[in-house]
Regions:
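N-terminal, positively charged regions that mediate nucleic acid binding
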Residues: 1-40, 45
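Glycine-rich, mobile lid/loop segments that gate access to catalytic sites or pores
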Residues: 6, 10, 48, 66, ...
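Short, charge-patterned binding micro-sites
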Residues: 40-58
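Short glycine/threonine-rich loop-to-helix capping motif typified by GTGT followed
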Residues: 55-62, 234-251
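Active-site-surrounding "flap" and adjacent substrate/cofactor-binding loops of secreted or lumenal enzymes
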Residues: 58-72
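Short, small-residue-rich loop/turn micro-motifs
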Residues: 255-257
Length: 257
């Protein structure tokens, strides 16, 4: 019996992904100046507002507003349209006591090995497993979805498609045969934020020609493949202006089960 598997990917301008990118950039900035930095940074983005909250323990004090503005500019949003609120404070001393040194050191057990000197928190992110379907060692639907959003971002930043805006999402459904091998593309959904001036039929043609076709060369659509471009209709309002974003809500985009 054949089975169908669907994977999703979003562009860096998607509000949830924007928040992840800001949090990652704060962490990168701290680590580049202090390799022992500990950063627990959450971000929320909504209409005209970016809120950065959390705990940072580091010898370096990052300029959160500068980092946020840099990310917004890189993604394609106008930083001047956002107020930035920073609610960053030091890590709780009780929590810090558990990670400043290891349990072995606190119990006077031999902790001379570097691997036994650093304490561990109680949080983790569970990710998927490697597989042999693609050179990337990821399932084919995941690879195709990421190829679509990557091509969409390139088309935006290069100006290959005039009128694109930063927000976007792709979903790809691949049909697998009875032996568990992917063999055909069942459905492609591509949502791309755009300016109101670009006609829908022109946008569909451009996206098909410059995004979908090159991104899906690995497994091209057949005559029965369903290709849905902006199936909800107009996608003029997007990003934080239309939908509140939050860190951690797109973990399944970066991993899989």
């Amino acid at each position: 019996m054949n089975q169908f598997y669907t994977a999703e990917s979003v562009t860096e301008g998607h509000p949830d992904k924007l928040c992840d990118l800001i949090a990652d950039s704060v962490l990168d900035e701290c680590l580049s100046h202090d390799a022992l930095s500990r950063v627990a940074c959450e971000v929320m983005a909504t209409r005209g507002q970016i809120i950065v909250a959390g705990e940072i323990t580091s010898l370096y004090e990052p300029s959160i507003p500068s980092i946020v503005r840099s990310v917004l500019r890189k993604v394609g949003y106008n930083p001047a349209r956002f107020a930035i609120q920073c609610l960053i404070h030091k890590q709780s001393p009780d929590i810090a006591a558990g990670v400043d040194c290891s349990l072995e050191q606190r119990r006077n057990v031999d902790g001379s090995s570097p691997s036994l000197q650093l304490g561990a928190g109680d949080q983790g992110i569970m990710v998927g497993y490697a597989c042999s379907e693609t050179p990337q060692m990821l399932p084919l639907p995941v690879v195709l979805a990421h190829r679509l959003t990557s091509a969409l971002t390139i088309a935006l930043k290069s100006g290959a498609i005039q009128g694109l805006r930063p927000d976007g999402k792709a979903q790809v459904t691949v049909e697998y045969d009875e032996d568990g091998k992917p063999f055909r593309l069942d459905t492609v959904v591509l949502s791309a934020q755009h300016s109101p001036e670009i006609p829908a039929d022109e946008l569909c043609f451009e996206l098909t020609d410059k995004v979908i076709a090159p991104a899906l060369q690995v497994l091209p659509p057949d005559e029965d493949t369903k290709i849905l471009i902006n199936p909800a209709g107009r996608f003029v309002l997007g990003g934080p202006e239309a939908d509140t974003g939050l860190t951690g809500r797109k973990l399944m985009v970066d991993s899989f089960r």
